Amino acid sequence: MEIVRDIKTMREKVAEMKRQGKSVGLVPTMGYLHEGHLALIDTARKENDVVVVSDFVNPLQFGPNEDYLVYPRDMDRDAQLCSEHGVDFLFVPTVEEMYPKKGNQVDVFVDVKHLDENLCGRFRPGHFRGVVTVVTKLFNIVSPNRAYFGMKDIQQLRIIEEMVNDLNMNIEIVPVPTVREPSGLALSSRNTYLSAEEREKAASIYKSLLMAKDLILEKGVISTAEVIGTCTRFLSQQGFKVQYFQLVDYDTLELLPKIEPPQKIIIATAVFLGKVRLIDNLVIEVR
């Protein structure tokens, strides 16, 4: 495995691979890799001749009071895991390399409309603008045939799918299912902020999603307000501060006033456990 730190070299390496007729898969990450990231890497490894992992904590997608400065980082461990999982190139640019203007200023962004109005986008203004801008930069640098994103960040995945479609990018976006602990807790780099007791309690997040699924698919509840109310009360009783619990249309990410089959629905929530913000979702099809 080769570690690449600058854009020029990364482009040259990929261009050489493509001249040899090789396909390239990109796994964009913010580092501090866990089994969820490794599932993305392993999927990319099976489907491409060359695998590139980017390891970059992107300041553009953090709000002023969020955890950019303390976001967990362990570059040596990330490099070891990437090497063990057959990664060909680990791209680790600095902030100055990605945003070279004075003060890391960015004057041109890729913007998002409508798709960021609900779920996390409603509570993290500017977040998805930062995400799609850096992903566009990575796509331009690496020119992958395929790029891999986890379904745990479902709004991010859907926005990137639409971006690629709307901007005619010749890249296949490959969704990879959420990886969970045995308790059901979705793997996340931010889980490292949790104590052992909090980690145990956090398993209730997934239980709330399963509860919503059961209410809709098994009990036939058609009122989304009823589903949301039941699940929000459950989470509150478990000690969470619920930022949102929403049911949205898979394609448009618009809030659903009621269940009307056939529908593909994202059941999603964001909660605080102490100061730690955790998200999770489940995708269901109502026939």
From Swiss-Prot:
InterPro entries in alphabetical order: Cyt_trans-like, Pantoate_ligase, Pantoate_ligase_C, Rossmann-like_a/b/a_fold
Entry GO MF terms: ATP binding; pantoate-beta-alanine ligase activity
Give the residues the record marks as binding ATP.
Answer: 30-37, 150-153, 179, 187-190
Binding residues for (R)-pantoate: 61, 156
Q: Which GO terms describe its cellular component?
A: cytosol
Describe the reaction catalysed, as an equation. Answer: (R)-pantoate + beta-alanine + ATP = (R)-pantothenate + AMP + diphosphate + H(+)
Question: What's a Pfam family this protein contains?
Answer: Pantoate_ligase
Q: What is its EC number?
A: 6.3.2.1
Q: Coiled-coil regions in this chain?
A: none
Sites where the protein binds beta-alanine: 61
EC class name: ligase
Keyword terms of this UniProt record: ATP-binding, Cytoplasm, Ligase, Nucleotide-binding, Pantothenate biosynthesis
- Active-site residues are 37
The metabolic or biological pathway listed in the UniProt record of this protein is:
Cofactor biosynthesis; (R)-pantothenate biosynthesis; (R)-pantothenate from (R)-pantoate and beta-alanine: step 1/1
Any GO BP: pantothenate biosynthetic process
Q: Where in the cell is it found?
A: Cytoplasm
Assembly and interaction partners? Homodimer.
Similarity comment: family membership: Belongs to the pantothenate synthetase family.
According to its UniProt entry, the function of this protein is described as: Catalyzes the condensation of pantoate with beta-alanine in an ATP-dependent reaction via a pantoyl-adenylate intermediate.
What further fact does the record state?
A: The reaction proceeds by a bi uni uni bi ping pong mechanism.
In terms of HAMAP family, this protein maps to:
PanC
Could you tell me what this protein is called? Answer: Pantothenate synthetase
Organism name: Coprothermobacter proteolyticus (strain ATCC 35245 / DSM 5265 / OCM 4 / BT)
